[in-house]
């Protein structure tokens, strides 16, 4: 089905750019229909001029159908006859026509059919009488609107029938006039950015100068890139050259009547192109019959059906000479299938054009206002330079304030505009189901990955081709997948929508918060196919806590990539069997679960893991292609690879515990890459390996390997196979038994053997060569492309390389005995890279050579080199760090391609040439040139300029450095000020002036709009707060003399980090600002600061240690995002508000050495917090659930430190003791009686009574008394606990917060340890538990308390919310109100008599535990109506 009114991909053109009709006739039917009008329409039809159907039903009011027809016509012909004004219909039509003339530039042609124009204008004569009759009973407003329209149209240029010799003559001229006007190119597209370039390019493909050719052309490109807009503009431009033309938009349809659909297509096209609405088609082929002799222009838009093309434009020969057919589609294969070879690809606009497009939509001009520049750049970037996105986003932001733009940015960054999504979604919906799946895989997991890598994982080649041909992905020249960021967002939105808000039901997870929820809550389902934690989220402040059964519900999971995150408190018992990718760096497992079979595994990547082995036995590894275990230091063995017949890459770099490879590696006949460098313990290789596909072998840094492996690489033992081979051998002293094919690498000989003839050798790497020269004479090295002789400290000369004409890379780093290079190096015309770093003996390079291809020259560390090297005029990157060069010659101006020049630490360099212009130079690094006092004018091309640690006294004029992005002037102590021309650096992003101790002030009245990073740390003379940019993100002012922060800091809306450490004069911060983006504030060491900073409530990390702050105020609860609060050594601090416990994200709060603290926290606050976090759980549910909830509540306090807080009152100390399940340190000299088992020294044994074996204790609390460290004594920054029972051993280290070396006196250190459920005493039936504590501090005492859980169920009464419980110990008795249900008590091993009373009645149950009598007081809190009492010990006596 065809839809000729479909909206374009880009709603840029005005409404006049989409005209459906050429002519709209307005007339009084009974006056002209059967005479004049019928003759006129016949003439128009003959010239293929389209007009509105005159059979539309007419009434007293104009309906929407006719109103639309008026607006969609290019010309309105108004036929004024005697009775025209008798029709209110006609008069209302005329009013609308006049509006379109005024507002839409519609052309109007009046025809005066036997009436006088002046009578129409003034409503006089017979025409006037008819008009007055019609106006009776009409409102005055309606009458006036008619009069105005009549008066306006009557004076327009038109046709008066009375002035023509015949009606036929006038009609013929009128028709020609209309034809000329409709064929005049429209200017509706003239204001579209870049449109003319597209039109001219397509016109050249169309070969319009050829009058005989019939040409079909395709316009192809991604959805939203503007294909249809370009097509409409092109159609408008070309229409004047074709009498017969049609613009048809395809619209997909469903149905089984294929024949009927084709006939409708033909009718639609012929009606459009011939201007006949009543065409009847009863058989196929009518298009060819009717248009065979006609020169036509046909443009088919948004085509997605080959059948559509075959039906309408089957062959170019169907049409007359000079015809042009243009097909617009997103599917390149469709064009190929229709044999359209001339294809114009619409590419993305440049960044400059994209910005202009955005600005046209948003601001109505070509560039943004100054204060919108950065925002406009970011929006254009978010739109990915896609015209659709640029237009829609620009329009949505048009007329909005800067604040609105800023508030909208997070939404634009994270989501997809609805209008954009609607357009892009069409492309997705048209895909086959399998191609839709492939689209989602790439959008959610694999955008930016290498094609071959993803093809192996997905086992799908067809899908890539389909998505590429439909412009949904692009394959880069180097073989990587590239999907537009808006399409990527579309895919992720589609996947998210299907899950209905439940991350566990999605197919793909790529967001840390979602992954964290699914993994920790174990809510993953069989729907889940892929989990990929993006690299930028690897280092989140929260760990990804993986449970042993986290992946159990994800039985269809195929792709798991969690990078450096994955904290596994206990072993993993399950991995999905369908995994194809397992990528888990730093994995804490010792081996993979025994249930994992690896049958589908394609890529196994576990770098930096704690693995000792992967698995036991032989697994079906037929799909495995890559195994990467590099730097798995504990790995002792590689599993049986007998069935890994498709393995191509094995990376074992740095596996320091690996001794050998299994002999089964010989089955990996497709192995291409084997890297075992730095396998320090590797002793032997399997013998007689036949790895015919091996191309790369690296055994460098394997000092214990004594026999070089005899590997058949290619055709034989002796010769290299044809092709490229690389052998890397370092520390070659062990190469005693090299096979014959490698004997030219025997580094024990004086030099390489004279029969050395490696004609096929492409790369020769002999790093660490022990002798003075490599070989004698000239060798035939015609295939050699790279040579590396680095670390060959005895090498005095390099061999003659005059025949190595293909050599591109020569690496001679750290060849300390080399003094010069031979002049024959001038023959290396293909040499691109020459590295001679740390060749300390090198004094000079040849001067009469010009290596025409040399782009990179690195002579860093050649400390004897005094002359500037000029061995190539095409150098791009030149590194001369730490050389003895004292002067740069003016001939450096010949290096027109030089992009980077590094001369760091050239201490003899004093001046630079002033009369050169390095037009390509972008990076200049002169850091550490301590004799350099002046600097010439900076060229326009410079982007990165580093002048750190120089003697420069002033900065030159910066007016031309308009492209400078990064400027470093650190430690330029002679600099006092900066030039005002710094204001010209509108592209400057980072500016550093650390330790410029002479700097007193920065220029004012400048706003560096792009500046994000400003570092003035150590500018100890700087007294005024710098306000040189309102867009700063990171601001460093450590150790400056600033005493006051102005309230204008509130303008820094993008400021994320403010660091003002050691600003000792700073006393107060403004209170009337709220920096909405500030996340990190560091005021540590501001010793005069007395008040808590209140400049932002969005802070996440707040550093206030060593300040004079006296109170943490109540409003701390407003800091809802706070995760870190450092206030140690605040000697004046006295009070900490209990509201600090309302901060649910707080993970670390350190008040060490706050010796004045008296009040800290509050019982009621903690209790309320815990009540909020523990929810009702059915009695039948595993008791561990309750403890997990308590554990998470305790996480709020897990990083609280009160070391050396000697004035803590009793309430605060008791609170810390009973509520913390994680490490805490505070002053103390003896183990509290709360700990039921105590002993002197560092160990104790707990005897578990037989009566307690039915109990479940899930954790213990421990406490040790430690002495402060002696001066000079080494220490471990952690406490280690060893627990032994029934032959099992637990070990736990507490390192993050147990900085015991900072303690000034004896301290208590509390910690908690959780047992695994399978090790409960009721399951293992053990009688005692041994505890051993280890610490660098001497441990004076230790204590332990076992934490028990008991369940009580009673089905008789469940509706009562308050009950009584009497706890008796010895002779003491206390009544406590308690809600009925689940009793959670950490009873220790005390003898407790419990009586559970229901209301005021008799006890319904009692429990008695035998043992020594011990009184314990408890505080009981109630979760109302949920049946969960929670008991907290108050004290032990």
Curated annotation (Swiss-Prot):
Top EC group:
hydrolase
Domain TIR: where? 19-182
Q: Which reaction does it catalyse?
A: NAD(+) + H2O = ADP-D-ribose + nicotinamide + H(+)
The residues that the entry says bind NAD(+) are 28-33
Record key words, sorted: Acetylation, ATP-binding, Cytoplasm, Endoplasmic reticulum, Hydrolase, Leucine-rich repeat, Microsome, NAD, Nucleotide-binding, Nucleus, Plant defense, Repeat
Task: Provide the tissue specificity.
Answer: Expressed in guard cells and epidermal cells, but not detected in mesophyll cells.
Record-annotated active site = 93
PROSITE patterns with a match to the protein in the record:
TIR
Where does the record place its LRR repeats? 554-576, 577-598, 600-621, 622-645, 647-668, 670-691, 692-715, 781-805, 807-828, 829-851, 852-875, 877-895, 897-918, 919-939, 940-962, 964-985, 1009-1029, 1030-1052, 1054-1075, 1076-1096, 1097-1121, 1123-1143, 1161-1185
**Which EC number(s) does the record attach to this protein?**
3.2.2.6
Protein location? Cytoplasm; Microsome; Nucleus
Q: Which residues carry this modification: N-acetylmethionine?
A: 1
Under InterPro entries, the record lists:
Apaf_helical (IPR042197), C-JID (IPR045344), Disease_R_plants (IPR044974), Leu-rich_rpt_3 (IPR011713), LRR_dom_sf (IPR032675), NB-ARC (IPR002182), P-loop_NTPase (IPR027417), TIR_dom (IPR000157)
Q: Taking the first listed entry, what is the main subcellular location of this protein, grouped into a coarse class?
A: cytoplasm
Q: One GO MF term, please?
A: NAD+ nucleosidase activity, cyclic ADP-ribose generating
Q: Which GO terms describe its cellular component?
A: cytoplasm; cytosol; endoplasmic reticulum; intracellular membrane-bounded organelle; nucleus
GO BP: any one term: response to auxin
Q: Know anything about its domains from the record? A: The TIR domain mediates NAD(+) hydrolase (NADase) activity. Self-association of TIR domains is required for NADase activity.
The protein's role, per its UniProt record: Disease resistance protein of the TIR-NB-LRR-type. Part of the RPP5 locus that contains a cluster of several paralogous disease resistance (R) genes. Resistance proteins guard the plant against pathogens that contain an appropriate avirulence protein via an indirect interaction with this avirulence protein. That triggers a defense system including the hypersensitive response, which restricts the pathogen growth.
How is the quaternary structure described? Homodimer. Interacts (via TIR domain) with TPR1. Interacts with EDS1. Interacts with SRFR1. Interacts with HSP90-3. Binds to MORC1/CRT1. Interacts with TRAF1B.
> Member of which family?
Belongs to the disease resistance TIR-NB-LRR family.
Q: What is this protein called?
A: Protein SUPPRESSOR OF npr1-1, CONSTITUTIVE 1
Q: Which organism is it from?
A: Arabidopsis thaliana (Mouse-ear cress)
């Amino acid at each position: 089905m065809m839809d000729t009114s479909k909206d374009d991909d880009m709603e840029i053109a005005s409404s006049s750019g989409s005209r459906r009709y050429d002519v709209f006739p307005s007339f009084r039917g009974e006056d002209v229909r059967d005479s004049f009008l019928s003759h006129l329409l016949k003439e128009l039809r003959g010239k293929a001029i389209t007009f509105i159907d005159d059979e539309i039903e007419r009434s007293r009011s104009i309906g929407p159908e006719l109103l639309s027809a008026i607006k969609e016509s290019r010309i309105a012909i108004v036929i004024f006859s005697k009775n025209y004004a008798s029709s209110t219909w006609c008069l209302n039509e005329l009013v609308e026509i006049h509006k379109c003339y005024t507002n839409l530039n519609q052309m109007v042609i009046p025809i005066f059919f036997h009436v006088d124009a002046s009578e129409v204008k003034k409503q006089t004569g017979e025409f006037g009488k008819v008009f007055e009759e019609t106006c009776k009973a009409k409102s005055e407003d309606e009458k006036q609107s008619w009069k105005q329209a009549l008066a306006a149209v009557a004076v327009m240029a038109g046709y008066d029938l009375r002035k023509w010799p015949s009606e036929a003559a006038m009609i013929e001229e009128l028709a020609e006039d209309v034809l000329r006007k409709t064929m005049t190119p429209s200017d509706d597209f003239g204001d579209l950015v870049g449109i003319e370039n597209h039109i001219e390019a397509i016109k050249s493909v169309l070969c319009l100068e050829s009058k005989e050719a019939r040409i079909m052309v395709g316009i192809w490109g991604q959805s939203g890139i503007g294909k249809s807009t370009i097509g409409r503009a092109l159609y408008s431009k070309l229409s004047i050259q074709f009498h017969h033309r049609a613009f048809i938009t395809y619209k997909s349809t469903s149905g089984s009547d294929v024949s009927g659909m084709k006939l409708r297509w033909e009718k639609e096209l012929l009606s459009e192109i011939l201007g006949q609405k009543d065409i009847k088609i009863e058989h196929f082929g009518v298009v060819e019959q009717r248009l065979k002799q006609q020169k036509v222009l046909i443009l088919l838009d948004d085509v997605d059906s080959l059948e559509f093309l075959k039906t309408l434009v089957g062959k170019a020969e169907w049409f007359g000479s000079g015809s042009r057919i243009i097909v617009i589609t997103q599917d390149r294969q469709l064009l190929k299938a229709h044999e359209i070879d001339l294809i114009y690809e619409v590419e993305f606009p440049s960044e400059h054009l994209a910005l202009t497009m955005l600005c046209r939509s948003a601001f109505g001009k070509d560039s943004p206002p100054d204060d919108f520049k950065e925002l406009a750049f970011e929006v254009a970037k978010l739109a990915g330079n896609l015209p659709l996105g640029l237009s829609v986003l620009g329009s949505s932001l048009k007329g909005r304030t800067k604040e609105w733009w800023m508030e909208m940015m997070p939404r634009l960054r994270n989501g997809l505009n609805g209008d954009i999504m609607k357009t892009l979604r069409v492309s997705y919906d048209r895909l086959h189901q399998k191609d839709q799946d492939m689209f989602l895989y790439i959008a959610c997991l694999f955008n930016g990955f290498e094609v071959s890598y993803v093809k192996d994982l997905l086992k799908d080649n067809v899908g890539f081709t389909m998505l590429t041909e439909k412009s949904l992905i692009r394959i880069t020249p180097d073989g990587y997948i590239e999907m537009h960021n808006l399409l990527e967002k579309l895919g992720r939105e589609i996947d998210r929508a299907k899950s209905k808000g439940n991350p566990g039901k999605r197919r793909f997870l790529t967001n840390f918060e979602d992954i964290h929820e699914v993994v920790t809550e174990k809510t993953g389902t069989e729907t889940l196919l892929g989990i990929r934690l993006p690299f930028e989220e690897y280092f989140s402040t929260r760990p990804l806590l993986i449970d042993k059964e986290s992946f159990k519900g994800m039985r269809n999971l195929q792709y798991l990539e969690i990078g450096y995150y994955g904290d596994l408190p206990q072993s993993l018992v399950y991995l999905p069997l369908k995994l194809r990718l397992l990528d888990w760096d730093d994995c804490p497992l010792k081996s993979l679960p025994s249930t994992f079979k690896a049958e589908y595994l394609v890529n196994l990547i576990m770098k930096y893991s704690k693995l000792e082995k992967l698995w036991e036995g032989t697994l079906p590894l037929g799909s495995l292609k890559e195994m990467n275990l590099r730097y798995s230091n504990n790995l002792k063995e590689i599993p049986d690879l007998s069935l890994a017949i498709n393995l191509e890459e094995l990376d074992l770099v740095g596996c320091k515990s690996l001794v050998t490879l299994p002999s089964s590696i010989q089955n990996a006949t497709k192995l291409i890459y084997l890297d075992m460098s730095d396998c320090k313990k590797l002793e032997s290789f399997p013998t007689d390996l036949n790895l015919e596909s091996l191309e790369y072998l690296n055994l460098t840094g394997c000092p214990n390997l004594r026999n070089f492996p005899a590997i058949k690489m290619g055709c034989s033992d002796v010769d290299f196979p044809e092709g490229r081979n690389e052998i890397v051998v370092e520390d070659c002293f062990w190469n005693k038994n090299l096979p014959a094919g490698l004997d030219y690498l025997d580094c024990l000989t004086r030099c390489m053997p004279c029969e050395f003839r490696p004609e096929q050798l492409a790369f020769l790497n002999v790093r660490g060569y022990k002798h003075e020269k490599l070989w004698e004479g000239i060798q035939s090295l015609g295939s050699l492309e790279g040579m590396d002789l680095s670390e060959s400290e005895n090498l005095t000369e390099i061999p003659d390389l005059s025949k190595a004409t293909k050599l591109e890379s020569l690496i001679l780093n750290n060849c300390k005995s080399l003094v010069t290079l031979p002049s024959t190096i001038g023959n290396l015309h293909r040499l691109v890279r020459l590295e001679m770093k740390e060749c300390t003996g090198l004094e000079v390079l040849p001067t009469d050579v010009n290596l025409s291809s040399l782009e990179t020259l690195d002579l860093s560390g050649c400390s004897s080199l005094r002359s500037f090297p000029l061995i190539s005029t095409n150098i791009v990157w030149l590194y001369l760090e730490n050389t003895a060069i004292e002067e740069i010659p003016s001939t450096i101006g010949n290096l027109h391609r030089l992009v980077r020049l590094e001369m760091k630490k050239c201490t003899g360099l004093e001046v630079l040439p002033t009369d050169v212009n390095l037009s390509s130079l972008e990076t200049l690094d002169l850091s550490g040139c301590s004799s350099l006092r002046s600097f010439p004018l900076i060229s326009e091309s410079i982007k990165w300029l580093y002048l750190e640690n120089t003697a420069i006294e002033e900065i030159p004029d910066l007016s031309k450095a308009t492209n400078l992005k990064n400027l470093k002037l650190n430690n330029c102590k002679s600099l006092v000020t900066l030039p005002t021309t710094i204001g010209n650096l509108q592209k400057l992003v980072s500016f550093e002036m650390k330790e410029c101790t002479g700097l007193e002030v920065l220029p004012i009245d400048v706003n560096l709009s792009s500046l994000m990073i400003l570092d003035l740390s150590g500018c100890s003379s700087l007294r005024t707060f710098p306000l040189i940019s309102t867009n700063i993100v990171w601001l460093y002012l450590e150790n400056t003399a600033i005493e006051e922060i102005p309230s204008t800091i509130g303008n820094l809306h993008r400021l994320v980090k403010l660091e003002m450490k050691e600003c000792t004069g700073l006393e107060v911060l403004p209170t009337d600002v709220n920096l909405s983006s500030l996340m990190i504030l560091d005021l540590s060491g501001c010793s005069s600061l007395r008040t808590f900073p209140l400049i932002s409530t969005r802070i996440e990390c707040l550093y206030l240690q060593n300040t004079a702050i006296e109170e943490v105020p109540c409003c701390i609860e407003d800091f809802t995002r706070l995760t870190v609060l450092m206030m140690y050594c605040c000697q004046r601090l006295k009070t900490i508000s209990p509201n600090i416990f309302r901060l649910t994200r707080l993970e670390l709060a350190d008040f060490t050495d706050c010796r004045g603290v008296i009040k800290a926290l509050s019982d009621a606050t903690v209790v309320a917090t815990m009540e909020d976090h523990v929810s009702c759980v059915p009695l039948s549910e595993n008791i561990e659930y309750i403890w997990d909830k308590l554990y998470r509540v305790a996480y709020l306090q897990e990083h609280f430190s009160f070391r050396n807080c000697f004035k803590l009152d009793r309430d605060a100390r008791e609170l810390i003791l009973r509520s913390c399940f994680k490490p805490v340190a505070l002053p103390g000299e003896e183990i509290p009686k709360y700990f039921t088992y105590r002993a002197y020294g560092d160990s104790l044994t707990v005897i578990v009574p037989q009566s307690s074996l039915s109990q479940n204790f899930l954790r213990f609390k421990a406490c040790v008394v430690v002495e402060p460290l002696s001066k000079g004594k080494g220490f471990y920054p952690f406490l280690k606990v060893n627990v032994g029972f029934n032959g099992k051993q637990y070990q736990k280290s507490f390192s993050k917060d147990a900085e015991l070396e900072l303690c000034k006196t004896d301290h208590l250190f509390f910690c908690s340890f959780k047992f695994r459920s399978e090790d409960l005493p009721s399951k293992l039936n053990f009688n005692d538990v041994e505890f051993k504590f280890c610490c660098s501090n001497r441990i004076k005492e230790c204590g332990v308390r076992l934490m028990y859980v008991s369940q009580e169920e009673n089905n008789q009464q469940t509706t009562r919310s308050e009950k009584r419980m009497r706890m008796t110990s010895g002779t003491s008795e206390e009544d406590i109100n308690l809600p009925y249900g689940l009793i959670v008590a950490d009873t220790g091993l005390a003898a407790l008599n419990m009586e559970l009373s229901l209301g005021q009645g008799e006890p319904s149950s009692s429990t008695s535990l035998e043992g020594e009598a011990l009184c314990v007081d408890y505080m009981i809190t109630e979760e109302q109506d949920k049946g969960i009492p929670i008991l907290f010990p108050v004290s032990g006596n």
